[in-house]
Structure formats: structure tokens, C-alpha cells
Amino acid sequence: MSLSERKQICLQAMGLTLWQKKDANTADPGAVPQEPGSAGDPVEPAARPRVVVSPAIEQPVTAASADGTATLAWPELLQRIAGCTRCPLHQNRIQAVPGVGDQAAEWMFIGEAPGKDEDEQGEPFVGRAGQLLNAILHAAGLSREQVYIANTIKCRPPANRNPQHEESDQCYPFLQRQIALLQPKIIVLLGKVAAHRMLDTDQALGKLRGKIYRYQDRVPMVVTYHPAYLLRSPSQKAKVWEDLLLAKTALAEQSARQA
């Protein structure tokens, strides 16, 4: 079945085009859209992503876990995040950025930390990177209203630097509780900061892609590039489509397992 007109528009918004045979009425739904070639030659659709299941990731217990965060309901959790002073990042923030979306969503997307726009508006992924994430979601048949989006860090680091380990450790119980309350069926890790935090590794992001990991031996996780990186390296967008296909595969298997 060929992609719908809506999905083709979304792929174009990502800066991608999909090659299809002119004389064919059907197309492989697993085909990976590619960046347009400089010579205008069509690109053959890639094979479906190979599923490689990685061992479950043991999640570390931080000192902040003992303050009762692990028992909070959504309203109390969001209130505690908004008033958090656990690390120095609160001193320069306009506001904390807990997360946004459906609090019963199957899909959870985890980024790194708020930027200037997010700090001002109190919502993750609202700048140019957020616009690209919206296009990526639409290309996958999703919307911001259907997923839950959060960051590993809830306050903006100065000059948009990467979060420090101490800051991440203080914020991590909040993220753990968000996952526990949400109970997602699939988690997509956006960028190396989120991947390193959730997988407890320092491997290059390219080596972490193409595998299905397990959060607490339950929830499948897939690694992909951060939208901000894609704005600087648009040639990597097609790989994000591959990662989304892998996430869809993991979600289907998870749903079948729970049926």
C-alpha cells in the first residue's frame, strides 16, 4: 500500500522524499525515505530494519529517590518539579520544564534538556527542533497530543551546555516517576545525552542505534538522533525514519506479548 498523501507531506516536511516505482500500485511500507540525490537519481528503498534485542538496562538508584518522589501522583510530581531546588540549575531558570503530552500515551520521547525557548514557554521541544520533531511524529502517524515528551533534565543548563552528571542524578528520579506513571509501551531516546543517561553508557550514538533495549526489563527503548542535530546534519534524517520503523516493530511485539 502506498503512503497516504498526508504522510508524504509529512516526509517532505522532514526534508525527505520517498522513491516509488511509476508502474507499481504498491510500495513496501518499510521503505526508508532518503535525502534527495544531487543527480536526481531514484534511491532504492532499504530493507526493513534488523531487530537486535539488547540486554535489559539496570536503572541506578539515586540519593534523591529517598525523598518520596517514587510515590507521587501526576499533580504532585509536576508541582515538585516546578519548585525543585535540588541543583544550581534552578537559580537561572525562568521555569522548570516537566514534560508535555498524553499522560496515558503508549509512546514516550525523551530528550536532553530545555533550551531558551523551552525555558521561556515551559514546554519541551517548542523551537525549530520542536517543529522538526512534530514533522517526525506526523510522518510516523503520531502527534504531540498522542505521545508524551520529556527531558532528562527539567531546567535549562547555562548557554545550552550538556547537563552535568550531578544535575542529571538529581533530576533522574523525576524522569523515573514519569515513566512509572505513564507506563509507556515504547520509549524513543532522542540524542546522546538521553541515550547515555537511560542506557548508562558512553558509547557513540551511532553504535547505539539499531537495537532494542529494555527499561527495567519491561519497556522497549530505541535510540535515534536529536532533532537539533538533524537541523545541523539533515542527511541523517533518513536514519531517524529507520529508527522509527524499529520502534514500531518493538511496539507491535510488546503489544502482542501483553495481549
What do the predicted segments below correspond to?
Residues 2-259:
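A polyanion-binding, active-site-adjacent surface
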